[in-house]
């Protein structure tokens, strides 16, 4: 799952698509309208393919081959042996090579699809109050924040309200650091409004207790850090008590880097021009081993790929392991933009499969024909699921161009994107359930070949 621009103000259950991508939500809906023909064709194809009962019982010999313990070995390799693998790093390439080797070993035609993306990393963040040196501040640089000058900067702090243009007309902001509340606007808009008013940096604090993190989506003109609700209130109190200056030192890397989508293709014997995509993102956030987010999804996809290696399928099945999902769904955006002729009939997205009791079959705003088929198949297999609306993962880019999707997702993991996302928390039994359902969906949608 991606980092939110502002989780508090998301209008859907998880991270808002317009908050983690470069396109606003209205552009997404416009794209969906533009691609209506693509959607209708894909839905009609799926309707024909899925009209008959799946006959899950007839697939039981294949489903019985699924092994959660075997899938768990991939989690160990990716999250424990390799560890955190942020897009654009050497560990990222190591994880890509591991996945490519697994696919090649099982007979898939493997492609490395390279693309560039805006890489961001934090080297150092320090916030101090020279007049109160004993206070400890846990500031976090927001994604795509630029650096301060070497050695940092010291300036007075002024309140900037919610960061709206009118909030900066009530006090002298030029040359100061703006203290801004979370809410109402996207973080990037708050930062740009502060910069336009003359602020040299911005501090955005949570309006609820606890820390927060977020993304500016793209670089802005001034350094931006976040504070917890408690620390934000403390700093605001110092400002109101007579004014305060702070020293802020932010050192980040903002540059274009290269990563890859790893693609494994198994051609269909009856209708090879129709393609079912099975996707899972393979990158992590910094400092997170990524056992559940998303080594678990990669492991489930690799397990399904291994089972299918000797099976003749009617349509082509393509396993795509996306890069730079955590940076803003860049890998799936690139893949969809270069997919070409509209041959994709559906997409199964696997993200966070190893922790939590609830399993969702989800879409975002597009057709739910594949999600409903997945729910039917799950019922035949005796797997409890709920149909939901979820965004914040790679299926959204497929829905953007009208491809029916189903997102298999376990939402109840409070430790994802943290250093505590470790292999001991991933349950092999849950991997087996997700892999069995994903395999049944693939077999039901692609059909058996000659």
Question: What is each model feature region?
Answer:
Residues 41-51:
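Bacterial N-terminal signal peptides
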Residues 59-65, 80-93, 159, 179-185, ...:
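Second-shell loop/turn segments in exported
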Residues 61-68, 73-177, 252:
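Noncatalytic luminal/extracellular "stalk/propeptide" segments of secretory-pathway proteins
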Residues 89, 137-229, 381-384:
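Extracellular/luminal Protease-associated
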Residues 103, 202, 262, 274, ...:
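Alpha-helical metal-binding/catalytic segments enriched in His/Glu/Asp
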Residues 134-136, 286, 312-313, 322-413:
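Metal-dependent peptidase/peptidase-like ectodomains
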Residues 138-169, 217-291, 306, 314-316:
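Soluble metallo-hydrolase cores and metallopeptidase-like ectodomains found primarily
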Residues 414-450:
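His/Asp/Glu-rich mid-to-C-terminal helical/loop segments that flank catalytic regions of hydrolases
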């Amino acid at each position: 799952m991606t980092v939110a621009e502002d989780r508090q103000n998301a209008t859907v259950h998880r991270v808002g698509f317009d908050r983690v991508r470069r396109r606003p939500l209205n552009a997404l809906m416009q794209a969906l309208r533009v691609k209506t023909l693509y959607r209708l064709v894909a839905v009609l194809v799926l309707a024909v393919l899925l009209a008959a009962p799946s006959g899950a019982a007839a697939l039981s010999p294949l489903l019985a081959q699924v092994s959660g313990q075997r899938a768990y070995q991939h989690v160990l390799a990716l999250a424990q042996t390799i560890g955190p693998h942020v897009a654009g790093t050497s560990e990222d390439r190591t994880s890509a090579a591991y996945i490519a080797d697994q696919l090649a070993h099982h007979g898939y035609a493997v492609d490395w699809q390279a693309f560039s993306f805006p890489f961001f990393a934090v080297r150092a963040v320090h916030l101090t109050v020279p007049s109160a040196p004993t206070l400890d501040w846990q500031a976090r640089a927001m994604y795509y924040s630029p650096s301060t000058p070497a050695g940092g900067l010291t300036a007075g702090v002024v309140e900037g309200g919610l960061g709206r243009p009118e909030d900066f007309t009530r006090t002298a902001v030029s040359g100061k650091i703006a203290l801004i509340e979370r809410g109402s606007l996207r973080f990037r808009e708050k930062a740009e409004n502060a910069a336009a008013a003359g602020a040299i940096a911005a501090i955005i604090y949570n309006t609820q207790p606890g820390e927060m993190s977020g993304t500016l989506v793209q670089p802005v003109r001034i350094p931006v850090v976040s504070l917890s609700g408690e620390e934000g209130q403390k700093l605001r109190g110092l400002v109101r008590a007579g004014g305060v200056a702070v020293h802020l030192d932010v050192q980040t890397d903002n540059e274009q880097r290269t990563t890859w989508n790893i693609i494994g293709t198994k051609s269909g014997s009856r209708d090879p021009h129709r393609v079912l995509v099975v996707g899972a993102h393979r990158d992590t956030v910094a400092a997170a081993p990524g056992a559940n987010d998303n080594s678990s999804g990669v492991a489930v996809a690799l397990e399904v790929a291994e089972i299918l290696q000797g099976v003749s399928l009617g349509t082509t099945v393509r396993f795509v392991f996306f890069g730079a999902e955590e940076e803003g769904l860049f890998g799936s955006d690139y893949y969809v933009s270069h997919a070409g002729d509209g041959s994709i009939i559906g997409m199964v997205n696997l993200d966070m499969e190893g922790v939590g009791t609830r399993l969702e079959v989800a879409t975002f705003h597009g057709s739910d024909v594949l999600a409903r088929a997945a729910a039917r198949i799950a019922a035949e297999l005796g797997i409890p699921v709920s149909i939901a609306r979820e965004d914040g993962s790679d299926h959204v880019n497929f829905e953007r161009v009208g491809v029916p999707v189903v997102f298999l997702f376990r939402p109840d993991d409070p430790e994802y994107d943290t250093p505590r996302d470790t292999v001991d928390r991933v349950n092999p039994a849950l991997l087996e359930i997700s892999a069995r359902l994903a395999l049944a969906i693939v077999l039901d949608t692609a059909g058996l070949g000659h």
